[in-house]
């Protein structure tokens, strides 16, 4: 969203050396040449529910309750694109329930048979079967042929991003490639490689105005800052008050095409 000019990320200088990093998020007018998907709209509205500026730390333990609406829209989008026949999260939940019931029944059967008969071992297969279902629940959502094709495309693009240095001659002639594909590098966990590849060109990226820092632009430091922001954001918006169930932001993109929610010109990041 920042790369696409929906918001600006501003580093907040630390007041002391061991202080925690924080960022100010500032909403911008919606670009005329870009459209948001429903889950992106919900994410943006959730971030700026209280105004057009918010500090990232202020979202801790408050955003998680809004996150479920974002995830619902994301999973619905996956189904509407025909990547899955059913929402992956609901398929997983179904198998977790079945596995839990089988495990509980197996344990209960083992105890009852052990007390009243000599056939206590007969309940163990049910318990083991339930345990296996619980472990395998996250792999149960099956992609459609279209979803599998998208996964292959994403995995292929991941290889391209990971080996960015091999494509520098082509990308050097294109405008704003570093910034445009940076969100993918973050998702794929290769921000440092992406930055080093473009640093070798010996020129600064054309547009990083969406990220404001008091330090001059250096590729390595910029990659570091972006990774730090990404990790902090993931933890912050999924953080719940003590005693509440976690929303589990780690599952936000799970079950999709190679882990990505898909669509929206570069993801919601």
Residue ranges and their predicted role:
Residues 2-106, 116-117, 143:
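Donor-sugar nucleotide-binding helix/loop cap in glycosyltransferases
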Residues 61-69, 73-88, 92-93, 128-131, ...:
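Short hydrophobic helical membrane-anchoring segments positioned at the boundary
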Residues 104-113, 132-135:
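Hydrophobic alpha-helical transmembrane segments and adjacent interfacial helices
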Residues 111-130:
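Hydrophobic alpha-helical transmembrane segments
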């Amino acid at each position: 969203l920042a790369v696409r000019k929906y918001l600006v990320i501003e580093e907040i200088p630390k007041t002391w050396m061991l202080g925690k990093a924080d960022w100010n998020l500032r909403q911008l007018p919606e670009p005329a040449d870009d459209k948001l998907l429903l889950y992106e709209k919900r994410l943006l509205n959730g971030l700026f529910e209280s105004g057009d500026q918010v500090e990232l730390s202020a979202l801790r333990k408050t955003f998680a309750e809004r996150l479920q609406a974002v995830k619902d829209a994301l999973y619905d989008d996956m189904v509407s694109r025909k990547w899955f026949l059913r929402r992956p999260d609901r398929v997983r939940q179904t198998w977790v329930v079945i596995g839990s019931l089988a495990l509980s029944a197996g344990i209960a059967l083992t105890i009852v048979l052990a007390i009243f008969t000599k056939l206590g071992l007969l309940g163990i297969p049910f318990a083991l079967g339930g345990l296996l279902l619980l472990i395998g629940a996250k792999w149960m959502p099956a992609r459609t042929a279209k979803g599998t094709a998208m996964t292959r495309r994403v995995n292929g693009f991941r290889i391209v991003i990971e080996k960015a240095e091999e494509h520098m001659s082509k990308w050097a002639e294109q405008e704003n490639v570093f910034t445009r594909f940076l969100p993918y590098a973050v998702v794929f966990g290769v921000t440092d490689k992406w930055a080093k590849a473009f640093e070798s060109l010996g020129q600064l990226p054309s547009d990083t105005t969406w990220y404001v820092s008091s330090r001059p632009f250096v590729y390595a430091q910029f990659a570091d800052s972006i990774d730090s922001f990404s990790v902090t954001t993931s933890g912050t918006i999924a953080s719940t008050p003590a005693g509440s169930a976690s929303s589990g932001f780690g599952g936000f993109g799970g079950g999709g095409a190679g882990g990505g929610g898909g669509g929206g010109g570069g993801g919601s990041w």
